[in-house]
Amino acid sequence: MALRTGSPALVVLLAFWVALGPCYLQGTDPGASADAEGPQCPVTCTCSYDDYTDELSVFCSSRNLTQLPDGIPVSTRALWLDGNNLSSIPSAAFQNLSSLDFLNLQGSWLRSLEPQALLGLQNLYHLHLERNLLRSLAAGLFRHTPSLASLSLGNNLLGRLEEGLFRGLSHLWDLNLGWNSLVVLPDTVFQGLGNLHELVLAGNKLTYLQPALLCGLGELRELDLSRNALRSVKANVFIHLPRLQKLYLDRNLITAVAPRAFLGMKALRWLDLSHNRVAGLLEDTFPGLLGLHVLRLAHNAITSLRPRTFKDLHFLEELQLGHNRIRQLGEKTFEGLGQLEVLTLNDNQIHEVKVGAFFGLFNVAVMNLSGNCLRSLPEHVFQGLGRLHSLHLEHSCLGRIRLHTFAGLSGLRRLFLRDNSISSIEEQSLAGLSELLELDLTANQLTHLPRQLFQGLGQLEYLLLSNNQLTMLSEDVLGPLQRAFWLDLSHNRLETPAEGLFSSLGRLRYLNLRNNSLQTFVPQPGLERLWLDANPWDCSCPLKALRDFALQNPGVVPRFVQTVCEGDDCQPVYTYNNITCAGPANVSGLDLRDISETLFVHC
């Protein structure tokens, strides 16, 4: 399905390469035959004959053709005419190609097709007419293609569809009408398409859907109505689609969803209502969606969530509610969502979360609460979320982490707390997070870390503490982090690291100490990258060990790193890692690595 389950252009390209086999002919003799005794290839085209399938493909793509080439072999199975300048297709243009089952006319500046243009194509299976300039199609255009299974009319200028346009296409499986200018569709335009599985109507100007429109599409599996101008979802519109699995209603102007609008859609697995103007959800908005797995409601205007709103969605796995106007999460807001794995509530206006708000979310693995203004979280608010492995609380106005804020999160792997105003973290408030692998406290207001803050975090690998106000770290604060691999302490106010501060970090490979107030430092063995620039280094005897280490390990302490650059116009960006001396006066401004060895002879 276009833009949702795979690009038709990709299918076309793959088919092209499959068609190119050992019998591919091109170049020296444009009129060469497909094989020694086969039919002649048109002069302006290239032909490929597949011995295994006994199929002939004719490639006339992007040849600047203004009319169809002469001499297309009658045995042709696939004909590629895309990327030309054909303008129109005359009557009976393909009448001798009764074996044709694939015809590609996309991107050929077509403005019209004569009513009899497809005469003789009774075995045609795939027809690509997308990316042209078609404004209308004759009512009987497709009566000569009864075998058609896939029809793509996307990205044209169609403003209306004639009654009976698709009559007789009982085998049609995939119909793409997306990205046209359709405002209203006739009630019976899809009548007779009983085998249709995928219907794309995205990118049009539809303002409403009449219940009769989708009658007879009982086999439909996927319906894309995104990027239209729909203002509401009314009851009974989708009642005749019992097998529909995916419904896209995103990027419309929907302000309201009628009660029981999706009743009877037991097969629906994916419902996208994001990027609309929905202001509220009722308790009976989603009844009947017993098989729903994904519900997307992000980028709406929802201000509150009522208890039991999602009570019937027992098999829901993903619920997206980010970028709304939700102010509070009350008790049992998500009751009934026992199978939910992903919950996004980012970028709302949530200022209060009640204890019990997440009751029943036994299987949730990822929760995003970032971009709200929580200020504080009640203790035990996450109790019962033992399977949660990623918790996002970035940019949430948090000022303090209490002792039992994260109680119950025994399975948490990643905790993101960056860009808050955290100035206080209570001792052992992280002690229950024994499975934690990554902790991000970047860009807060921490001035010190409690001695036992990391007690119990023996699995932690990534610790990010940059852009705080740390002036010192006690020598045993990092002791429990024996598996730490990556430590970022940049952009703080650290002066003199305690002796042995990093000695217990035997697996440490990345250490960032740039932009602190360090004057001396003894490097840690085993490091693979060490950042030290923007410190007021005292380049006297205490720094000799660092000088020797930097000179012996230029890959660990590089003078600069060039950022990977992509694109023709991309300018390389260099990150410098200077060890600039602030003193003594005779070496001030020099890089430690450039100072003569003689200055350290008496050290």
From Swiss-Prot:
Residues 32-74 form the LRRNT domain. Its main location: secreted. It is found in: Secreted, Extracellular space. Disulfide bonds join C41-C47, C45-C60, C539-C581, C541-C603, C565-C570. Residues 1-23 form the signal peptide. The keyword Glycoprotein applies. Keywords: Cell adhesion, Disulfide bond, Glycoprotein, Leucine-rich repeat, Repeat, Secreted, Signal. It comes from the Eukaryota. Residues 535-603 form the LRRCT domain. The keyword Aminoacyl-tRNA synthetase does not apply. Glycans are attached at N64, N85, N96, N368, N515, N578, N586. LRR repeats lie at residues 75-96, 99-120, 123-144, 147-168, 171-192, 195-216, 219-240, 243-264, 267-288, 291-312, 315-336, 339-360, 363-384, 387-408, 411-432, 435-456, 459-480, 483-504, 507-528. GO terms for cellular component: insulin-like growth factor ternary complex. One of its GO terms (biological process) is cell adhesion. SUPFAM superfamilies: L domain-like. Forms a ternary complex with IGF1 and IGFBP3. May have an important role in regulating the access of circulating IGFs to the tissues. This is Insulin-like growth factor-binding protein complex acid labile subunit.
